[in-house]
From Swiss-Prot:
Residue ranges the record assigns to the propeptide: 1-2
GO CC field: extracellular region
Subcellular location as annotated: Secreted
Tissue: Expressed by the venom duct.
Domain of life: Eukaryota
Protein name as catalogued: Conotoxin Cl14.10
UniProt-recorded Gene Ontology molecular function terms: toxin activity
């Protein structure tokens, strides 16, 4: 089984290049997903 982790970055409160909060969503994907 190959397991892959995908991450998605969401930034909030950005002024120019400075951001107040960065939230990272990560989830695993597999070739044989039996339950979600």
């Amino acid at each position: 089984n190959e397991r892959h982790v995908t991450c998605f970055y969401v930034k909030f409160g950005c002024k120019h290049t400075e951001c107040i909060t960065t939230i990272v969503f990560c989830w695993q994907t597999a070739s044989d997903i039996s339950s979600v």
